[in-house]
């Protein structure tokens, strides 16, 4: 019986291995992690991450051919294929700080694999890593191998949180990169045979190691680029009276462009986009390609601009001051159908409003209060490091931030409300009830274009929607730069 072990029980490792176990009942799959609370959660009825469909998959396989354990060395020792899905956060200090990927956890995992292994293994990069990381990992394994043969493969994930299980069931493609040697090709075939249990062979793409590693960074950079492009267009639409939704539809019907990732918003977030673009920028700079680096820098700059522009619009619309005013924040996760708050635009918007002395009342259906408070108190880039290493700001935010359990409580007596996550439930709220319980004039700032602005204006709201023609009230406010 083939045994697969995955080091790292996070957003990638857990769901990926759960689906692999479901589709390959004859293969034993073990997910290991040094975090005992996380493993205990995977073995409980309350999983550590929220993902539609994940709970059903885990329940079908757990205890049969899917296991979760803190005994990392034991299961690595017993496995034939080892997936490494540990964090590769952005470095916070030293060479490349703020851009380069921190491979500390990856190197530690590689050294442990070499130390405990007594038989040949296929080691699979599942984490997103800089191009040519496999070469460094190969050297670590080879120099510590004690004669054992290791084959390194790159098998990047292309999951979207909120649809991860669907993406795993029906992937656009599976990408496997390996060495162009007999042993390397044999390793590629072994992993391809695993995926072929449910993925059509023609959708399994095999490349060299470096192409696979760079393809993941490129895919995320291209997606983020589209978001920044439409967000830059949203600013121009507001200035000219055009409607970004109509512009995006007209552009997206061009078959060369397509409609996906053309929804204007308050900005992109999540664990990958910004981190991977910063990594790509650093790689370009290290390879003497400043023009290429500057191109990708602009994608991040536009994203930051969009968040600042939104927060400034809130302040300027409300008589240029939000000091002491209650503002409801609807949605804190970086997108709907996930509890993930990593790099969510809500953090920057909330912190900017707090800096202007606003009082925030925050509601998100999946994000816990502890997480929200930690995010608003944390130094940048620390979110992807272990909790003991996270630096929390000395100044507290408790007096200005209140986390509540429903949207109606959040909006009661508020001067304005900001929609920062596109949760479906926000579309069906009783906005007449909300309006009646808010201070007047009552403002809605829709950062996701999910509410019906026409109906809200009929109720009496002053509405700002990203990239849409401005209310006459908003046109009279100071320009937002």
Curated annotation (Swiss-Prot):
Q: What happens when the gene is disrupted?
A: No visible phenotype.
Q: Does the keyword Oxidoreductase apply?
A: yes
Reaction catalyzed: UDP-alpha-D-glucose + 2 NAD(+) + H2O = UDP-alpha-D-glucuronate + 2 NADH + 3 H(+)
Q: Give residues annotated as binding substrate.
A: 157-161, 216-223, 256-269, 334-335, 448
GO terms in the biological process aspect are:
UDP-glucuronate biosynthetic process
Cite the active-site annotation. Answer: 272 (nucleophile)
- InterPro entries in the record: 6-PGluconate_DH-like_C_sf, NAD(P)-bd_dom_sf, UDP-Glc/GDP-Man, UDP-Glc/GDP-Man_DH_C, UDP-Glc/GDP-Man_DH_C_sf, UDP-Glc/GDP-Man_DH_dimer, UDP-Glc/GDP-Man_DH_N, UDPglc_DH_euk
SUPFAM superfamilies under this entry? 6-phosphogluconate dehydrogenase C-terminal domain-like, NAD(P)-binding Rossmann-fold domains, UDP-glucose/GDP-mannose dehydrogenase C-terminal domain
Name the UniProt key words of this record, in alphabetical order.
NAD, Oxidoreductase
Control of this protein's activity: Inhibited by UDP-xylose.
Residues the entry annotates as binding NAD(+): 8-13, 33, 38, 86-90, 127-128, 161, 272-275, 342
Tell me, what does this protein do in biology?
Answer: Involved in the biosynthesis of UDP-glucuronic acid (UDP-GlcA), providing nucleotide sugars for cell-wall polymers.
Give the family, as the similarity comment puts it. Answer: Belongs to the UDP-glucose/GDP-mannose dehydrogenase family.
Protein name per Swiss-Prot or TrEMBL: UDP-glucose 6-dehydrogenase 1
Name the source organism: Arabidopsis thaliana (Mouse-ear cress)
């Amino acid at each position: 019986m083939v045994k697969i072990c995955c080091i790292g029980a996070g957003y990638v490792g857990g769901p990926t291995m759960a689906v692999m176990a479901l589709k390959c009942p004859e293969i034993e799959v073990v997910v290991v992690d040094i975090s005992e609370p996380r493993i205990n959660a995977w073995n409980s009825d309350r999983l550590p991450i929220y993902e539609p469909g994940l709970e059903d998959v885990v329940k079908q396989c757990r205890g049969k051919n899917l296991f979760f354990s803190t005994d990392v060395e034991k299961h690595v020792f017993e496995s034939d294929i080892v997936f490494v899905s540990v964090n590769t956060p952005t470095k916070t200090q030293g060479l490349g700080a703020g851009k380069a990927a921190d491979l500390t956890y990856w190197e530690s995992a590689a050294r442990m694999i070499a130390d405990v292994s007594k038989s040949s293994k296929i080691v699979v990069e599942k984490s997103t890593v800089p191009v040519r990381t496999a070469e460094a990992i190969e050297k670590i394994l080879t120099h510590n191998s004690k004669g054992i043969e290791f084959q390194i493969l790159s098998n990047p994930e292309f999951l979207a949180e909120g649809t991860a299980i669907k993406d795993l069931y029906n992937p656009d493609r599976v990408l496997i990169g390996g060495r162009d040697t007999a042993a390397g090709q044999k390793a590629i075939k072994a992993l391809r045979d695993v995926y072929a249990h449910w993925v059509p062979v023609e959708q399994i793409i095999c490349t060299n190691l470096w192409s696979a590693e760079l393809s993941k960074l490129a895919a995320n950079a291209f997606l983020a680029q589209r978001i920044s492009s439409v967000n830059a267009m949203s600013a121009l639409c507001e200035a000219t009276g055009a409607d970004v939704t109509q512009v995006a539809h007209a552009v997206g019907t061009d078959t060369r462009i397509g409609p996906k990732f053309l929804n204007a918003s308050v900005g992109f977030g999540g664990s990958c986009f910004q981190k991977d673009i910063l990594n790509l920028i650093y790689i370009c700079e290290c390879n003497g390609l400043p023009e290429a680096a500057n191109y990708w820098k602009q994608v991040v700059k536009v994203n930051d601009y969009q968040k600042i522009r939104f927060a400034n619009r809130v302040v300027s619309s409300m008589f240029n001051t939000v000091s002491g005013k209650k503002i409801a924040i609807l949605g804190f996760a970086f997108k709907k159908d996930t509890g993930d708050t990593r790099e969510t635009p809500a953090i920057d918007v909330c912190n900017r409003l707090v800096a202007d002395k606003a009082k925030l009342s925050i509601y998100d259906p999946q994000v816990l209060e502890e997480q929200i408070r930690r995010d608003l108190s944390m130094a940048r880039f620390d979110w992807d490091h272990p909790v003991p290493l996270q630096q929390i700001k000395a100044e507290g935010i408790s007096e200005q931030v209140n986390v509540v359990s429903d949207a109606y409580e959040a909006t009661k007596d508020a001067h304005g409300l900001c929609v920062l996550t596109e949760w479906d439930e926000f579309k069906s709220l009783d906005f007449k009830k909300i309006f009646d319980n808010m201070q007047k004039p009552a403002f809605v700032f829709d950062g996701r274009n999910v509410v019906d602005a026409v109906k809200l204006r009929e109720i009496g709201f002053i509405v700002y929607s990203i990239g849409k023609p401005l209310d006459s009230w908003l046109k009279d406010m100071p320009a937002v730069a």
